[in-house]
Amino acid sequence: MTTPNGMPDNPGDPENTDPEATSADRAEQAAEEAAARQAEESPSGQALEEEISPELEAEINDLLSDVDPDLDGDGEVSAVETQLAERTEDLQRVTAEYANYRRRTERERQGIIDTARASVVTQLLPLLDDLDLAEQHGDLNEGPLKSLSDKLINILGGLKVESFGEIGEAFDPEIHEAVQDLSQGDVKVLGTVLRKGYRLGDRVIRTAMVLIGDPEES
């Protein structure tokens, strides 16, 4: 116990002078201070924005590794020593749970970001289809429309959005929607692409609409 000025009631007590006896308390105090700072910075129900500092986590682990259940070295573990060992185990468990929680909330936060991006890209699909048709008719060779198309493609590329569905590409029912199968052999490829597909990273936003054909003979 400490007085209001931060000094222990009995500075000479082994509990306050023995490094082994105080290491667990120091570790627990460090963990509590980290948790208090995190609670102030992150409102309830929101994902954590910052991780516990590597220096603090290393300090906690170092302090915990120095704890010996037999503090007085008499070969027997007293009730106080048993309680200290239990508190140390509890702190180790809480530290591991906090690390797992931090990783889980980070995954959830990234999932929310990806969902929002996918929603925006979905709303832009009609515009992308119009630009694709304009390119097929030769309207994107030059002029302001080409400049607009290039800028939009660059922005989407920065968001890891890419199109797929090219003639001759192997048919994949997971990402290609076949309107008609005109192939006669076992090997099926895209004979005609009616509408391009788009993906955001590993997430398919829209499948490609295609006609299946046979591969061209080389």
UniProtKB/Swiss-Prot annotation:
Record's GO cellular component terms: cytoplasm
Main subcellular localisation: cytoplasm
Protein name: Protein GrpE
Task performed by this protein: Participates actively in the response to hyperosmotic and heat shock by preventing the aggregation of stress-denatured proteins, in association with DnaK and GrpE. It is the nucleotide exchange factor for DnaK and may function as a thermosensor. Unfolded proteins bind initially to DnaJ; upon interaction with the DnaJ-bound protein, DnaK hydrolyzes its bound ATP, resulting in the formation of a stable complex. GrpE releases ADP from DnaK; ATP binding to DnaK triggers the release of the substrate protein, thus completing the reaction cycle.
Region (Disordered): 1-75
Record's subunit section: Homodimer.
PROSITE patterns listed in its UniProt record: GRPE
Species the sequence originates in: Corynebacterium glutamicum (strain R)
Keyword tRNA processing among record annotations: no
InterPro entries: GrpE, GrpE_coiled_coil, GrpE_head
Compartments it resides in: Cytoplasm
The organism's taxonomic lineage, starting at the top: Bacteria, Bacillati, Actinomycetota, Actinomycetes, Mycobacteriales
GO term, biological process aspect, one: protein folding
Ranges of biased composition (kind: Acidic residues): 48-75
Biased composition (Basic and acidic residues): 23-40
Pfam families assigned to the protein according to its UniProt record, in alphabetical order: GrpE
GO MF, one annotated term: protein homodimerization activity
Similarity-based family: Belongs to the GrpE family.
UniProt-listed Gene3D superfamilies: 3.90.20.20, Head domain of nucleotide exchange factor GrpE
This protein's UniProt keywords: Chaperone, Cytoplasm, Stress response
Key word Chaperone present: yes
